[in-house]
Structure formats: C-alpha cells, structure tokens
C-alpha cells in the first residue's frame, strides 16, 4: 500500500511533457496565420502555441523546388532522432504551396497562401499570388517570431534555419533580407545546402 501511494505521489510530482509528433501526416501539421484571412501550412513536432519547457532548440527545414515539405520533415525527424535530440528539438518544415499552373499543381486549402513557382517566386521572397500584401519572407518571419516567444518556449537556446536546393536559395536570400534576425532574442544560425 505504501509503495503504491508513494508511486501515485511521484506521478503527480513529475511534469507531463508533450510527446513529439513524428508523422508527416495532417496530425503533425499546423496553420500559421498570416494577416486576417491568409494562412500557410507547416509540419511540426510540437505545437507553436502550447507552452513547452522541454524545447531547447529549433530546426526549421525549407524544402526544395518540389515543395515536398513532408519529405523534408521526415528527413529532419530522422536526423533529430539519430542525434538523440528529438524530445528537446522542435522540427518545422514550412510548405510553400503553389498551383499557378506552370508545373505546380498543389491542392490548396481555403485561404492558404499561393506562391508562384516561376519568376518572383517564394525562393526569392516573392509576393504571394493570392495575397499581394504577403511575401514568402513574411511566412518565415512569423514562424521565427512564434519560436522566439519566451512564454511558449522559455528554454529555447537557438534556432537553425536550413534549406536544400531551392530551399538553400531561399535561406541564403532570407539571411540577407529578413527583418527579424536581430529582434528575436534567440541566436539564429543559417545552414545552406546545394543552392
């Protein structure tokens, strides 16, 4: 009886932590609001609006020209797992969706921001084809602002923003042009691969 009572007391004293979402399915997605009517999709291991004392680092992975954020999310999950860092790392892969008819035929949800695949596209901070007030950099700015909230992620020590191929082009340009780097209060590291 004493052992079960002691065990019950210990269970009450142990904080409950969120479990990372580890599937590249809708259960691991979240909509990021961009203005009043616009939204953009991310894959993520933890919700951006629920307090999480456990998260110490963030890894934001930008997909390539194929706009396959789900595959990049899977790869980043595997890397975090192999590094033994899955539980205290929030992994995010934003989706720059497009269905502008030039080889890009993503299915968009209601109010989902549509980015161009050609010309002044999402990889260069281009203006959305569905909302002329938004650029692809606005989307990343909002993700980073949410990560830097101390009331949600009080123990976040650093953010890594990385991209491969067209995602690498995006990260290179974003590093030079973003408006939030010096305002976040969290160190931000940029890693570019095969731009």
Task: Identify the residue ranges that each predicted region occupies.
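Conserved alpha/beta-hydrolase
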Residues: 86-101
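Glycine-rich "HGGG/HGxG" loop immediately N-terminal to the catalytic nucleophile
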Residues: 98-110
């Amino acid at each position: 009886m004493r052992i079960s009572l002691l065990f019950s007391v210990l269970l009450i004293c142990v904080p409950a932590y969120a479990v990372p979402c580890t599937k590249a399915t809708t259960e691991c997605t979240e909509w990021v609001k961009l203005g009043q009517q616009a939204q953009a999709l991310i894959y993520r291991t933890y919700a951006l609006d629920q307090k999480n004392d456990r998260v110490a680092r963030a890894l934001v992975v930008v997909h390539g020209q194929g706009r396959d954020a789900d595959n990049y999310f899977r790869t980043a999950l595997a890397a975090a797992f192999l590094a033994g860092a899955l539980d205290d790392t929030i992994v995010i892969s934003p989706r720059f969706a497009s269905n502008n008819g030039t080889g890009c035929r993503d299915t968009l949800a209601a109010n989902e921001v549509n980015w161009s695949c050609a010309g002044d596209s999402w990889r260069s901070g281009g203006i959305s084809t569905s909302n002329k007030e938004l650029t692809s950099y606005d989307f990343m700015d909002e993700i980073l602002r949410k990560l830097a909230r101390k009331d949600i992620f009080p123990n976040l020590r650093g953010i890594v923003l990385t991209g491969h191929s067209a995602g690498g082009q995006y990260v290179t340009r974003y590093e030079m042009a973003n408006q939030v780097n010096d305002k976040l209060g969290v160190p931000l590291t940029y890693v570019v691969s095969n731009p």
